[in-house]
Amino acid sequence: MQDVQRTVEVSVGPIVGLDYTLLYDTLPETVSDNITLPDLKDPERVTEDTKKLILKGCVYIAYHHPLETDTLFIKVHKHITEFCHSFLSHLLGGEDDDNALIDIGLFFNMLQPSLGGWITKNFLRHPNRMSKDQIKLLLDQIIKMAKAESSDTEEYEKVWKKMPTYFESIIQPLLHKT
């Protein structure tokens, strides 16, 4: 019997149903002018800064979403959450913990220097209560703060390891707000 070895490998492409060419064409020029189409499918090709640029482009796409019945929504927008989850996992080092909730208290404290003027623990627990602009600000701040770091820190274990799933839960309501 062959041993199965567990590896920490995050696959971004292909996400079934996602039209990568349309995704590329939908990204703002500040993003698409600095990446190639294969960069969207293979994060190994790009630097940490480029990964952040792509994630910011995805937040832009989610913020400026079309109607849910639009072909663009069906081929790109409804897949943005899964794409962001995978891409952020890769940015943070590939280790992803979907089984536990983020430590809201610790995350709240981490956000104080940048978003302390308005962010509340209640908003962090219930992102659908935030306005479209507040969700975008929070997502942009997460991207700005995200980095691959040592996995033996409390911050990594309680916040960043769980962040891809949390990020997905924040970007989802953005796709449905008008």
Curated annotation (Swiss-Prot):
Keyword terms: Host cytoplasm
Cell compartments where the protein resides: Host cytoplasm
GO CC annotations, alphabetized: host cell cytoplasm
Transmembrane segments annotated in the record for this chain: none
Keyword Ribosomal protein part of the UniProt annotation: no
Stated role: Induces the formation of large intracellular inclusion body, organized in amorphous and crystalline arrays. Presumably the main cause of the stripe disease observed in host.
Protein family per UniProt: Belongs to the tenuiviruses NCP family.
Protein name: Major non-capsid protein
